[in-house]
Amino acid sequence: MISIIMPVKNESLTLFKSLNHLQRLRDLNICEIILVDGGSTDNTIKIASNLVDHILITKSGRAHQQNIGASIAKGDILLFLHADTVITKEQIVSLKSIIEKNVWGFFKIIFDNRKIRYKILAYLINFRSKVYNYGTGDQVIYINRKIFNKIRGFPPLEIMEDIKICSILKQISQPSIRDSYVITSARRWEKYGFFKTILKMRILRFFYHLGVESKKLARYYE
């Protein structure tokens, strides 16, 4: 079984699109879906109630939420899915065969906004992932559960938990980068400005690698 773990907070506008097409996999017992809510004040939980197998409520924080979800997961594969990213049934099923060869990996991405700037951005993200062998949460990171437990899950960071766990996993094996694309939302770039958001991300990465405390980085990110 594959356990899909989704950390959320106020995602009522995206949940149905992300989860409705996966219901057949639940019916066939191919996957379970665990939603971990970090304090939503909208209709997130109400909408999710018929789309997931488990709803957990805890404090906000993506690393913490994902670890809480993983703690009750039954699957051999843990797949961490952001609420604004769409993955197909076929992509999920394909993991059953490759997980025996690679203990972790992620997908390539495209954006739901098809403007040329987003095509270029997606290309650069995918190229970076190939060169440096790490993915971000939007790329749907998946991990063999035994390995996840061995490394004690996501590190307790407020932000950059995806980058950190990839650096830990690379010490065990190189990732399997799937040659197929998940679709992720461009909403942050659209809301805060395309170039401004890219600059902000670069600044965050720079100070993260300098060792700045994740709580300070998270405040800047928000």
Where would I find each of the regions flagged by the language model?
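Short beta-strand/loop segment that forms part of the nucleotide-sugar
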Residues: 6, 30-39, 56
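Short, well-formed alpha-helical segments that are part of the catalytic scaffolds
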Residues: 10-25
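Acidic helix N-cap motif at the loop->helix transition within catalytic regions
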Residues: 13-17, 42-50, 90
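Conserved donor nucleotide-binding strand/loop of the catalytic core
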Residues: 31, 45-72
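A conserved acidic beta->alpha catalytic loop
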Residues: 37-45, 85
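Short aromatic/hydrophobic "clamp" motif used to bind/position activated sugar donors
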Residues: 78
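Conserved donor NDP-sugar-binding/catalytic core segment of glycosyltransferases
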Residues: 90-117
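Hydrophobic helical membrane-anchoring modules
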Residues: 167-222
